[in-house]
């Protein structure tokens, strides 16, 4: 056996190990009851925002009105917290963290939890949005997907996309946008779980945070978080509409990461 064959033989178990870890990650993140519950809750919040628009004949109006004219949007952070944000608290409560730390370092354990929560937060919000898009023809059978019936609900930076009827890009933009916010809401709930040992507080804190930031934004001359979640401002281009939320939610997610690592390492030393 030559040197190249030996290298291939040695690399095969490593590749299988990586594939196994990826499969476990996908299974524990997406194929769970909590992920399905979070996606259904997200879809339900969209539907609640459209309760007064049952007679609408425009698909685009139904989709836009579900967030633009709805007060239920403050419940969206709970959806991102459903799949994985409580895992850290449950591991501590059941003393599973002690068993996990026998096989890996504290830093790796906390990083894995944080990444899984961020990915699941993005995915559950995106899945809920896509599920709502699929339910619109069922809940609103008279709604027609046409630019001619947009009724002033389209933001200027997406006007050309809607005129070309590139609906994949149009709805994909909003799905990506709500997914970005889902990353932050998920890791925020995870960070709270490292400091607070109460399930209700973990779920309620992101809602209160969103409401408080929206209340303070006009006084601080800033864009509100809910406005950035759904691009409710008149940006010049779609790149700006995507960049502002990315910077805002990304920077706050970094702060959550630092707070979670600090408290998580301290909790692991005390356990």
What does each of the following model-derived ranges do?
Residues 1-91, 194-195, 211-271:
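Hydrophobic alpha-helical transmembrane segments
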Residues 15, 19-26, 107, 111, ...:
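Alpha-helical membrane-protein architecture signal
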Residues 41, 111-112, 124, 205-206, ...:
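Hydrophobic core positions of alpha-helical segments in small-molecule transporters
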Residues 47-86, 114-194, 230-248:
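Secretory targeting signals
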Residues 86-120:
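Helix-loop-helix units of permease transmembrane domains in multi-pass membrane transporters
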Residues 97, 144-146, 266-271:
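Short, Lys/Arg-enriched, Gly/Pro-containing loop segments at transmembrane-helix junctions
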Residues 105-107, 198-203:
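Membrane-helix interface segments
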Residues 116-130, 200-234:
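Hydrophobic alpha-helical transmembrane segments of integral membrane proteins
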